[in-house]
Amino acid sequence: MSVEDVVRINLDFLDHPERSGIFNVGSGRAETYNAVAAAVINAVRAAGGRPPASVEELVREGAISYIPFPPALVGRYQNYTKADLARLRAAGYGAPTLTLDEGVRRYVEWMMARERG
C-alpha cells in the first residue's frame, strides 16, 4: 500500500469527523513478494530507460534470487495478507488506491529525485 493512499485516507477521515471506528487500510489486493520485488526493480529500470522485465526474466538475470525459508519461521509466518476493506467502504470511503506498480513507481521516482537534489 502506498503512503500516498494512507495519507489520503487519513485526511478524508479528518474531513469527516462523523466517521469513527477502527478500519483496515490497504489496497484490498494480495500481492506476492515476487510482485513487490519486480515492481521495485522495474521502477528503477524505467528510470534508467530500460524496459520492464517479468519475474522469470529478473530471476534469470540474477536481479531476484531466493534463499531457503528459515526453519525458525515455519508455522509462525503469515504468508498471505489482504486487507478487508468492507468496513472502510461502508463508512463512506470509496476512492481507489494506487496499484502496486504505480505506488512503487512514484516512490522510486521520489527517492531518486531526492538523491539528485
Predicted stretch roles:
Residues M1-G117:
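C-terminal substrate-binding subdomain of Rossmann-fold SDR/epimerase-dehydratase oxidoreductases
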